[in-house]
């Protein structure tokens, strides 16, 4: 059988040209979508936590990069985990006479920040960040953008179940039927922790852990170590598993565990809610697993949500849950949903950290 090589070359050339054209068209479409949402120098204002915290720093960095890309000027106010400080910042900003195109607002204590969001809503549409609005604040908030805290809690629960299975396989004898669980929660009153605990309880209800204590306040390596040093000595003979607010806090608690004679990953198994902070302990097995929640992605998504709101002046639909993808997807030139959730994925061990990429 004689093969016409020239025909194959022609077909290959056509396929290559078609693929190249599709790529160019996709890139052009994405660029057109971005152009449609350009800010043209309009101002956005963002109220969030301090950049001295690694999560706050990365969230601000992601927001600033996306604002620059879309042509918005971004002014950022940082509070040091203090609602009174944030209240003062809001009052000063309002008194300045500023007229932003939109407000991005992370209330430190949601229930105590109702007056802030009420007054900010008189200036511009409000996008609430990280902590979902409650019934009192929804009349003044147009959209939520950020982490899906229930999903994070569910992911934490599923990962703790895997940790329990791994502990059983390693021959660990539990101190109660389902294993004793010590919880280090976010600061009391922060809705982030409340929602995550709801998600955790929902996915573990059929095979529950025995919660021996819940301690509020661990949210950084320093507070994790300080609080852990006080709590762990009281419960060190009772602990099988630890549920920890985030990896920053876990890194401090690991230090406290070691100082009290407990080896993480052997005597006790830890799971953290999100990946803020150094992930070395996840890679070396001292933390069994965490959730990949890049703060920079949360900041970028908040800017995208605000840009959509500025362009269209309304929300459309209830929920958009962003899928996990290695690269940031193009922005759709549509109104934002009421709830705009960033991607989230579990990561167990070094391979989990290495192989889970979200928006770069």
Positions of the model-derived regions?
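Hinge/cleft segment of the Venus flytrap/periplasmic-binding protein
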Residues: 33-42, 177-188, 204, 299-360
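Short, hydrophobic alpha-helical segments
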Residues: 70, 94, 160-165, 232, ...
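Beta-alpha junction/loop-to-helix N-cap segments that form part of ligand/metal-binding clefts
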Residues: 80-135, 142-147, 247-251
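Hydrophobic alpha-helical
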Residues: 102-122, 126, 200, 213-281
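Short, low-complexity disordered leader/linker segments with a strong preference
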Residues: 1-43, 68-69, 98, 118-123, ...
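Flexible loop/hinge segments that line or gate small-molecule binding clefts
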Residues: 116-151, 162, 167, 173-180, ...
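Hinge/beta->alpha junction and helix N-cap segments in small-molecule ligand-binding domains
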Residues: 46-61, 75-88, 109, 130-131, ...
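Exported/periplasmic ABC-transporter solute-binding proteins
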Residues: 244, 255-333, 344
């Amino acid at each position: 059988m004689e093969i016409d090589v020239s025909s194959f070359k022609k077909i290959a050339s056509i396929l290559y040209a078609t693929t190249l054209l599709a790529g160019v068209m996709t890139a052009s479409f994405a660029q057109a979508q971005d152009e449609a949402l350009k800010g043209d120098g309009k101002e956005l204002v963002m109220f969030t936590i301090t950049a001295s915290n690694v999560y706050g720093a990365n969230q601000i960095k992601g927001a600033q990069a996306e604002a620059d890309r879309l042509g918005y000027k971004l002014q950022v106010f940082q509070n040091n985990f203090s609602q009174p400080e944030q209240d003062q910042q809001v009052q000063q900003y309002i008194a300045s006479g500023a007229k932003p195109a939109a407000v991005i607002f992370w209330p430190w204590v949601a229930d105590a920040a109702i007056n802030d969001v009420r007054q900010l809503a008189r200036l511009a549409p409000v996008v609430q960040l990280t902590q979902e609005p409650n019934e009192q604040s929804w009349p003044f908030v147009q959209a939520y953008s950020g982490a899906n805290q229930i999903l994070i809690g569910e992911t934490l629960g599923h990962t703790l179940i895997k940790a329990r299975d791994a502990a059983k396989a390693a021959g660990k004898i539990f101190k109660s039927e389902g294993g004793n669980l010590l919880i280090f929660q976010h600061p009391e009153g922060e809705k982030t922790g409340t929602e995550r605990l709801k998600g955790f309880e929902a996915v573990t209800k059929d095979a529950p852990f025995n919660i021996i204590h819940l301690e509020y306040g661990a949210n950084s390596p320093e507070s994790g170590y300080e609080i852990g040093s006080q709590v762990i000595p009281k419960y060190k003979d009772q602990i099988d598993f630890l549920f920890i607010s985030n990896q920053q806090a876990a890194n401090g608690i690991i230090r406290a565990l070691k100082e009290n004679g407990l080896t993480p990953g052997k005597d006790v198994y830890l799971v953290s809610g999100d990946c803020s902070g150094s992930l070395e302990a996840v890679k070396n097995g001292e933390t069994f697993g965490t959730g990949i929640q890049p703060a920079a992605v949360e900041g970028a998504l908040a800017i995208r949500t605000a840009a959509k709101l500025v362009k269209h002046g309304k929300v459309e639909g209830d929920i958009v849950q962003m899928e996990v993808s290695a690269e940031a997807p193009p922005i759709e030139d549509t109104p934002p949903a009421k709830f705009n959730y960033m991607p989230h994925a579990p990561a167990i061990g070094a391979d989990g950290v290495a192989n889970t990429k979200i928006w770069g």
